[in-house]
UniProtKB/Swiss-Prot annotation:
Protein name as annotated: Cobyric acid synthase
Keyword Phosphoprotein in record: no
Underlying gene: cobQ
Family membership noted in the UniProt record: Belongs to the CobB/CobQ family. CobQ subfamily.
InterPro entries listed in its UniProt record: Class_I_gatase-like (IPR029062), CobQ/CobB/MinD/ParA_Nub-bd_dom (IPR002586), CobQ_GATase1 (IPR033949), CobQ_N (IPR047045), CobQ_synth (IPR004459), GATase_3 (IPR011698), P-loop_NTPase (IPR027417)
Organism expressing this protein natively: Brucella canis (strain ATCC 23365 / NCTC 10854 / RM-666)
């Protein structure tokens, strides 16, 4: 079994995913064969791994930081929320059904075998495995049968480092409180802590570090400052979208309705990085900005439910007004399905609504079918004759007259649809804006000159900068010696 260290948080969104990605790059730069692992993830931001299954995009990014192909075994259990009470269950990359509330709690102990099998496969040939927990180990109401945090750590005998987020406040209480509430067996697994997202003079927190150690007996591995490189990396949790604020007006405003079950929102990251583009996330209850040149309907885990939510917010009427003003629309995956005349779900795959009228902006119809398409693809944009690399994760088959004007060609078949005037576009492909030449041509067609950024290189540079920041702020030797 490979050496391993597990990073657990005092809560969600404390920065574990990016921290592990940065430490993966640190270990790689030190010449170690390092691999990422997350026993259980809950996210609709999924990736298609290099071996052809679904994993969290955070683990895909961590694999990139390690310089290795991504694998379904890096995230053996993935939960994709599709209703308020249930999630689609993905085990080792493949759909296993729906997990609902208490039923999933009863199912978790059975999943430990798959988790441990994947952990062994990830560790095979590795010098170090960096493990990421989920949520917080302090949620002791979920401790029985746990596979995500201390349940895994105790089962696999992996030492734990706790991560506290000082930016949200109360970090001393959150760490000391976690120490207090953990059962003795779990507390014994914790070897220390680190503080994340500090702004200002770190020396001002010296007394805080001493207080945490005094109350817990845990050693400090350091304080990570607020690192600008993090903003250039894909975010895993949609909570980060809720904090977006409008900046100075740019040449092109791209409006994105924040659908309740938004998925794969990192499709937007390359656009956000363009200096002439402002991506505006529009929360429920707010209107689409009238000055938007492009509206993107993003992917969603539940197309029909989110189409209903779109209508409840009045965004359907605003979208029609946007088109009448000469605006453009791009639908991606579930957003593409919404643009059509009708969505049918006779088997009730998505829920109780069997048939619903679409937005009618494209002359297409979608039939939901049980078979799920999960694959990485190489394609050619038929709008601009430029190569694309992306991935598909969807159910449903779409057809109709506007499919005669496809968005892209994948091998021997076409993808997507374009309206006769070219202003309404839809595709099943995620990741299209990561292709620099396509992105620049796409923006130019909207009257905006794209920058010279190479998006993939910018992600690699951000990982290197993150690693440098962690080397400078943490006791890396002490951390890696835990394994």
């Amino acid at each position: 079994m490979a050496r391993a260290i597990m990073f657990q948080g005092t809560g969600s969104d404390v920065g574990k995913s990016v921290l592990v990605a940065g430490l993966c790059r640190v270990a790689r730069n030190r010449g170690l064969k390092v691999r990422p692992f997350k026993p259980q993830n809950m996210s609709n931001n999924a990736a298609v791994s290099d071996d052809g299954g679904e994993i969290g995009r955070a683990q895909w990014l961590q694999a990139l930081a390690c310089g290795v192909p991504s694998s379904v075994h890096m995230n053996p259990v993935l939960l994709k929320p599709q209703t308020d009470m249930g999630s689609q269950l993905i085990v080792q990359g493949q759909v296993r059904g729906e997990a609902r509330g208490r039923y999933y709690q009863e199912l978790k102990p059975q999943l430990m075998a798959a988790v441990m099998e994947s952990f062994a496969k990830v560790g095979d040939g590795a010098d170090l495995v960096l493990v990421e927990g989920a949520g917080s180990p302090a949620e002791i109401n979920l401790r029985a049968g746990d596979i995500a945090n201390m349940g895994f750590a105790t089962h696999a005998d992996v030492p734990v480092v706790l991560v506290g987020d000082i930016d949200r406040g109360g970090v001393i209480a959150s760490l000391v409180g976690t120490h207090t509430i953990l059962p003795q067996e779990d507390r014994a697994m914790v070897r220390g802590f680190l503080i994340n997202k500090f702004r200002g003079d770190i020396s001002l927190f010296d007394d805080g570090l001493a207080a945490i150690t005094r109350f817990t007996g845990w050693r400090s591995f350091g304080v990570v400052p607020w690192l600008k490189a993090v903003s250039r990396l894909p975010a895993e949790d949609s909570v980060i979208l809720e904090r977006a604020v409008r900046g100075d007006k740019k040449a092109l405003i791209v409006a994105v309705p924040m659908l309740p079950r938004i998925a794969n929102f990192d499709d937007l990251d390359p656009l956000k990085a363009e200096p002439a583009v402002e991506v505006v996330m529009v929360p429920p209850g707010s209107s689409l900005p009238a000055d938007a040149g492009l509206v993107v309907l993003p992917g969603t885990k539940s197309t029909i439910a989110d189409l209903l939510a779109l209508r409840e917010n009045g965004w359907d009427r605003e979208l029609v007004a946007h088109v009448k003003r000469g605006g453009h629309v791009l639908g991606i995956c579930g957003g593409f399905q919404m643009l059509g005349r009708r969505i049918s779900d006779p088997a009730g795959i998505e829920g109780n609504v069997r048939d619903i009228e679409g937005l009618g902006l494209l002359d297409i119809e979608t039939m939901m079918e049980p078979e799920k398409v999960v694959r990485n693809v190489e394609a050619v944009s038929l709008l601009h004759d430029e190569p694309l690399e992306g991935y598909e994760i969807h159910i449903g088959r779409t057809s109709g007259p506007d499919m005669a004007r496809p968005f892209a060609r994948i091998g021997d078949h076409d993808d997507g649809a374009v309206s006769p005037d070219g202003r309404i576009m839809g595709t099943y492909l995620h990741g299209v804006f990561s292709a620099d030449r396509f992105r620049h041509h796409f923006l130019r067609a909207l009257g905006v000159e794209g920058g010279q950024m190479n998006y993939r290189e910018s992600v690699e540079e951000a990982l290197d900068e993150l690693a440098e920041g962690l080397e400078a702020s943490l006791d890396i030797d002490g951390l890696f010696a835990l394994a």
